[in-house]
A protein has these predicted regions:
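Cytosolic regulatory regions built on CNB/CRP/Popeye-like sensor folds
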Residues: 1-162
């Protein structure tokens, strides 16, 4: 992966990395790259290799899941400063959702193999990064739960037939 000068500064200004030391940010930047997706582009697909995670710098991304027989269900919409992808942390390292750019989106990707290697050698960095990801995972779980309750709730008082 090519290290682009200044990615550590972009990471430094992103809220997800707030409070991390300059040394930690430089280490993370060594695994980082800029990526741009156009509206409609798939960033990743459920079941694919979870080989990165992303910080959203600009744009809108939909997190979706297949929900037969309804087709794709949008679980969450992510915007600037949101973090996308935690499946790179958990074997077998497969995406559990789809991610699609709704608008042109600029992201910083962080290579999972590079990151896991860095985290294995730096337990302080691992602690700081994993602590942040617990919040991301809890947020996705909550969003998934709410959306699934809505999708499968069926008709009831004040609800139309689906």
């Amino acid at each position: 992966m090519v290290h682009i000068e200044g990615l550590d500064k972009l990471l430094h200004t992103h809220p997800f990395f707030d409070g991390m030391s300059e040394a930690m940010l430089e280490t993370l930047a060594g695994c980082a790259a800029n990526e741009v997706y156009q509206a409609g582009d798939m960033i990743f697909r459920e079941g694919g290799d979870a080989d990165k995670f992303y910080v959203l710098r600009q744009g809108t991304v939909a997190v979706e899941v297949a929900a037969p027989p309804r087709g794709k269900v949008q679980l969450q919409t992510l915007h600037e400063d949101d973090v996308l992808g935690w499946s790179w942390l958990v074997p077998p390292y497969r995406w559990t959702f789809d991610a699609r750019a709704v608008t042109q989106s600029r992201l910083i990707s962080l290579d999972a193999v590079c990151l896991r290697g860095k985290l294995d050698g730096d337990h302080e960095l691992a602690y700081h990064l994993l602590r942040r990801f617990v919040g991301v995972m809890a947020e996705r779980l909550h969003a998934s739960r709410l959306q699934m309750m809505d999708v499968y709730a069926g008709p009831g008082p004040g609800r139309e037939e689906l």
